């Protein structure tokens, strides 16, 4: 971030006076759009809804009821629900061109597509009882996303569509909350046709990303630095970086490398002309507590609930002195997995451990050059991943 700030200062000083660092391409209009605007911009229908969870969080969700290629057929369609990863939002699924974005591809393939948002991100930052300015609002991690957000959202979607089941597609933390929800909530698990897991994350024992250094900071020091509320929210300056800094010659490589350092390198597979769209909507924010939960996972190498810091606190939340482990062998939902050999967050060794514990693994493919973000943004994602998903969903619908 400081490197990008320095670049912004240099560009402001030199670029305006000497004509240096010219823009590589015009700013994409989706930079300033919300989710439904991004959808309709490409000629797709969009619907916005709000889901209220059992504990009062208000989640914005979006729907693409049909595609551009099949608008004449308005009958009931099979449902596909897409859930984003850490520090992200539903925009991840629609940030590329229509022929490169999974949400649009599924809509054109005849699916009723729904895009979820996890509590605390840009589109899910309200609660019936707590203000986002309060500490209480931010007292959550991916535990609560699995316990409250997923059940409420899936229940809403199925009631709205009149369907009994849906296809679930998760990326990164979107798979994490799926693993938890579908292994601890058998009733919910029965409502999932198939779980499509992209860059799945359960344990993070072997992850080698630079974020590990941040995760190793003691909790008290982490809170001293970042507070105890929101972590890395979307800010107007992100949009400035995306449109006025990262869209310029040479600096665009600096910006893309900032992503690669965290998620793994696959330099030839990122559409640089869409970089301003990616960066203007990400990061979308989460809670400090959620990041601390991931920090605990890095340190322990275990897949378990949030440790509240003392046996007494844990007893209050779990009726036991230690946070419970999540048992992946209890998840019997059919699951198809895609992971990347160059993924620094969902490390292949961690994925191998995960695969060995899944009792109903129906498909697995490892893509050697793929990093963590390739599954949502890679230029060849349709050929490498999405076409397989569409084909498998079609078979599952018969």
Swiss-Prot record:
Record-given protein name: Gastric triacylglycerol lipase
Annotated source species: Canis lupus familiaris
Domain of life per record: Eukaryota
Residue positions with a glycan: 34, 99, 271, 327
Reactions this protein catalyses: a triacylglycerol + H2O = a diacylglycerol + a fatty acid + H(+); 1,2,3-tri-(9Z-octadecenoyl)-glycerol + H2O = 1,2-di-(9Z-octadecenoyl)-sn-glycerol + (9Z)-octadecenoate + H(+); 1,2,3-trioctanoylglycerol + H2O = 1,2-dioctanoyl-sn-glycerol + octanoate + H(+)
Pfam families: Abhydrolase_1
Tissue: Expressed in the mucous pit cells of gastric glands (at protein level). Expressed in the fundic and pyloric mucosa.
Gene Ontology molecular function, alphabetical: triacylglycerol lipase activity
Cystine connections: 246-255
InterPro entries, A to Z: AB_hydrolase_1, AB_hydrolase_fold, Lipase_euk
The protein's Enzyme Commission number: 3.1.1.3
Family as reported in the entry's similarity comment: Belongs to the AB hydrolase superfamily. Lipase family.
Entry GO CC: extracellular region; intracellular membrane-bounded organelle
């Amino acid at each position: 971030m400081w490197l990008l700030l320095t670049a912004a200062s240099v560009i402001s000083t030199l670029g305006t006076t000497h004509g240096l660092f010219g823009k590589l391409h015009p700013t994409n209009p989706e930079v300033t759009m919300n989710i439904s605007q991004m959808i309709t911009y490409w000629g797709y229908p969009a619907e916005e809804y709000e889901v209220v969870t059992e504990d009062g969080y208000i989640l914005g969700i979006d729907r693409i009821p049909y595609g551009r290629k099949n608008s004449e057929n308005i009958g009931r369609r099979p449902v596909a629900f897409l859930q984003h990863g850490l520090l992200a939002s539903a925009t991840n699924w629609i940030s590329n061109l229509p022929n490169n974005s999974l949400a649009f591809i599924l809509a054109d393939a005849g699916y009723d597509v729904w895009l979820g948002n996890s509590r605390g991100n840009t589109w899910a930052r309200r609660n019936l009882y707590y203000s986002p300015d309060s500490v209480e609002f931010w007292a959550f991690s991916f535990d609560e996303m699995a316990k409250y957000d997923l059940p409420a959202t899936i229940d809403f979607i199925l009631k709205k569509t009149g369907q009994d089941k849906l296809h679930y597609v998760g990326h990164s933390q979107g798979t994490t909350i799926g693993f938890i929800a579908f292994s601890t909530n058998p009733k919910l698990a029965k409502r999932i046709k198939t779980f499509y897991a992209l860059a799945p994350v359960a344990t993070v024992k072997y992850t080698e990303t630079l974020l590990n250094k941040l995760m190793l900071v003691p909790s008290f020091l982490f809170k001293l630095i970042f507070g105890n509320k929101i972590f890395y929210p979307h800010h107007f300056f992100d949009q400035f970086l995306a449109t006025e800094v990262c869209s310029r010659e040479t600096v665009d490589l600096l910006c893309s490398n900032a992503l690669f350092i965290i998620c793994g390198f696959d330099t030839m597979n990122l559409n640089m002309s869409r970089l301003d769209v990616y960066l203007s909507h990400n990061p979308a924010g989460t809670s400090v507590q959620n990041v601390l939960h991931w920090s605990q996972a890095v340190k322990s190498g275990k897949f378990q609930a949030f440790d509240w810091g003392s046996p007494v606190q844990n007893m209050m939340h779990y009726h036991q002195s230690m946070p419970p482990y999540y048992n992946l062998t209890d998840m019997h939902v059919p699951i198809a997995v895609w992971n990347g050999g160059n993924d620094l967050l969902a490390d292949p060794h961690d994925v191998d451990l995960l695969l060995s514990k899944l009792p109903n693994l129906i498909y697995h493919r490892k893509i050697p050059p793929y990093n963590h973000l390739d599954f949502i943004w890679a230029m060849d994602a349709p050929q490498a991943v999405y076409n397989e998903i569409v084909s498998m969903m079609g078979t599952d619908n018969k």
